[in-house]
Amino acid sequence: MFNKANSITFVANYNSMKRFFTTLFVALGAFTAFAKSYTGRLVVTVNGETLSNKTASIDVDQQGDGSYTLSLKNFSISLSGQELNIGTINIPATPYALGNARLLQANRNVPISSLGNVPINLLAQESGDKLHANIDINFNGMTIKVVFGEGYQVPNSNFETFGESKEPNRWHSFQSVTGRFASSAQTDAAISSDQTRPGSTGKSCVLIKSRELDFFFFSVIANGTLTTGRLNAGSSTASNAKNNSFLDLANKDKDGNGDPFYTELSGRPDSLTLWVKFKQGKPSADHPYATAKAVITDGTYYQLPEEKGKTYKKMAEAINNEIADTKGEWKRLSIPFNYVNNSIAPKAILVTLSTNADAGKGSGSDELYVDDLELVYNFGVEGISIKGQALANFAENTTEYTHIVGNATADDIMVKTKGQGMLVAKTVENGKATVLVASNDLSKYRLYTINVATGIDNLPSVEANKQVEIYTLDGVRVNKADRKGVYIIKDAQGKTRKVVKQ
């Protein structure tokens, strides 16, 4: 929680924080001509707690020297019930081409009067009409994180906000069910609970409850279900596929908050994590498990369970059909995504949580608590090679190398990554290769610099500058032979000779 214990500086020094951000704006410099403006969701967190979640605009402008500037317009955050207006923050950034997209990166210490150097770390992706950006500011022991753009996490996946229907915002249960039997199925099946998971910084989770439904002369168990799509009650037979959760980006229906019955997704996550606490009201040996499912699709109609005989356009799925009774304890689950069709571009995700993995099974008093659901994007590099030659002694956290090879281009560089959708941008200029590697959600990145030495047999010509060049036996150019060893000297006529420095 963001309270007195961990927010002494941020809350007690309100004016200091205002001065910090205001001075930051001035220190980064003012730029007036902007090429493109993006509007989207801006989320600001301090030490893990969300302080602001609103619509904002960011401008991106190309400068005369080829660099870019990101301008966060009219930046403000909510602090202790007050709106803190910061102004416009401008961040110069270096561009890296990435297919039809562009990555923008900055990592610099900003000197601010009376505050010293404040580190700012930026990584953004500009693709078509969308911008996604991560900005990290470390100030006085606080981690301030600014995320712009959606499409990489499920909104309200920490279950902190609930609407008038009692459903968590951007999630839907039987309160908003549709279909032939909607009137019989409607109930408060998913509600807020204060039983948060251990270590949570939030105040609530979601409680999903099953119940019995009476149909004339018989009754059925209605599994408690929550989804990012919408529930359809189309049959009195529980196992019928007409009873489902579904999404369709073409569907124009809105819930009571004005939100659609779907969640858009642009990312390629590696796993789904969530905290659960599950209790069967009446133990069932044949049907003991709750379930959690997430399916990434191209945004066309999709439902769970799938209707037999129909083909759906799905890219990946993460499924756990064996969530056992946790005996009153919280348990963290990590469910890997299985990519079934990588050729499909991600457009939407359908997450469905239910008190039983089998339709109509379990009891009418089962309870599934869920907290802090998250899409995880792996980050890591296993190796880098140039023209098929692996970098010698490669270590993931070592970022500078020298590699002897003939003339190389960016296409000659291969990077083996650990994440499903990791981003790799490469440039080669003036004998130096730069490789920018990032997680698919931009939350982590690393820059590798490789001095691409040509070797003794491939020394570059110096006819243009008429100067003598000095190389080590490894092919690395140096300013002078000031240490013991063997050097290769190349004169203005292109002639070379070996020199031994004693």
Predicted segments with their positions:
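Aromatic (Trp/Tyr/Phe) and Gly/Pro-enriched flexible surface segments
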Residues: 148-269, 273, 287-298, 303-378
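Extended, low-complexity, turn-rich repeat/linker tracts enriched in Gly/Pro/Ser/Thr and Asp/Glu
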Residues: 78-80, 278-288, 300-303
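Terminal processing/anchoring signals of secreted or surface-associated proteins
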Residues: 72, 274, 456-459, 475, ...
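Beta-rich interaction/scaffold domains
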Residues: 378-456
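Residue-level detector of functionally pivotal "anchor" positions at catalytic/ligand-binding pockets or at interdomain
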Residues: 378-385, 453-477
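C-terminal tail/sorting-segment detector
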Residues: 19, 454, 486-502
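Bacterial Sec-dependent N-terminal signal peptides
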Residues: 1-39, 475
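Edge beta-strand at a domain terminus
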Residues: 35-41, 54, 88-98, 128-155, ...
